[in-house]
Amino acid sequence: MRPRLVWNVFRGFWARRGVVPACRHLSCSNLPLEELFARGGALRTFLERQVGAEAQFQVRRPELVAVAKLLSDKEQELQETQHLLHDENEDLRKLAENEITSCEKEIAQLKHQIILLLVPSEETDKNDLILEVTAGVGGQEAMLFTSEIFDMYQQYAAFKRWHFETLEYFPSEIGGLRHASASIGGSEAYKHMKFEGGVHRVQRVPKTEKQGRIHTSTMTVAILPQPTEINLVINPKDLRIDTKRASGAGGQHVNTTDSAVRIVHLPTGIVSECQQERSQLKNKEMAMKKLRAKLYSLQLEEETSKRYNARKIQIGTKGRSEKIRTYNFPQNRVTDHRINKSLHDLETFMQGEYLLDELVQSLKDYANYESLVEIIAKEV
């Protein structure tokens, strides 16, 4: 085993580049990894410990060293190819330029793989989730925007080939959405969606505005991981279950049967309701699914607060009141304020496909680097 190999790869790349290439697509001026590389001794100690002895890396260690070796070889290839840029043969110089571009792309991918191998996955990453959207400041315009965001996530679920089931849906008078929730399940659904929680702000001329003025409205997204039976056990004695007649849309059975269900978790006071379906049994099942997600989220928050001290990871530990993203329609731009990243072409972004997925990946990348900083601060 050669634990120093990983360190040498990181040190060599840092000396030549100064920043992590996998982060080039992020608009970040103070990446945690820059700070990390500035303390080279800490990184070296950490890598030698992890690759050399840490039990958590016993499974990953062969893969980590293999990827590090590939990266070291690719770095050497890049260095040798760069010398050809000064060759007298123009065709050879052009060939070298193409090879350098290809090498740099592969180096970025390999470096990214190493970061992923160093940062342990979270317990909830493979979980399904509950999505909740709620209109905020801005009246009917906020409700219209809430409806668009809910649709965007439904389309994103289809794009990722996840299962999407609406649990609640309370529309407004003009086609907007006051509040809605959905169950989303699929491959690493929570891992992709966990950074979407927070306040989303829209700036545009509302459909209801007659004088053409730009308004600012908000809506809130909550992302709650769904627990497994092992993760969370609820004592039936801790629950109070009430039934009532449903109100609002629902066809001929509205207000004729006690189909709506309200569940109260007595120890915490957390409430979960559902009247989406005509069947009381189905509504109870959906309400319990939401309640379990809320209780599990509370449990995770308590564990997280114990785990992290004064230095907080910037993404994923802030409250739901935090403004995370602005959708500026006049400028055709969406900006995520946590990583200072902007994307243009809002219409395409709101379709919930490639552009949203790009932003989700950027958030995951940045969170991984922050996690690595936190881990090293504790270990070294």
From Swiss-Prot:
InterPro entries xrefs: PCRF (IPR005139), Pep_chain_release_fac_I (IPR000352), Pep_chain_release_fac_I_sf (IPR045853), Prokaryotic/Mito_RF (IPR050057)
Modifications made to the protein after synthesis: Methylation of glutamine in the GGQ triplet by HEMK1 is conserved from bacteria to mammals.
Organelle transit peptide residues: 1-25
PROSITE patterns registered for this protein in UniProt: RF_PROK_I
Residue positions, PTM N5-methylglutamine: 252
An annotated GO BP: mitochondrial translational termination
UniProt keyword Coiled coil present: yes
Compartment list: Mitochondrion
Keywords carried by this UniProt record: Coiled coil, Methylation, Mitochondrion, Protein biosynthesis, Transit peptide
Coiled coil: 63-118
GO MF, one annotated term: translation release factor activity
Region (GGQ domain): 236-300
Position of sequence motif GGQ: 250-252
Any GO CC annotation of this UniProt entry: mitochondrion
Record remark on domains: The GGQ domain interacts with the peptidyltransferase center (PTC) of the large ribosomal subunit to trigger nascent chain hydrolysis.
Similarity comment: Belongs to the prokaryotic/mitochondrial release factor family.
NCBIfam families xrefs: PRK00591.1
Function according to Swiss-Prot or TrEMBL: Mitochondrial peptide chain release factor that directs the termination of translation in response to the peptide chain termination codons UAA and UAG.
Protein name (database record): Peptide chain release factor 1-like, mitochondrial
Organism the protein comes from: Bos taurus (Bovine)
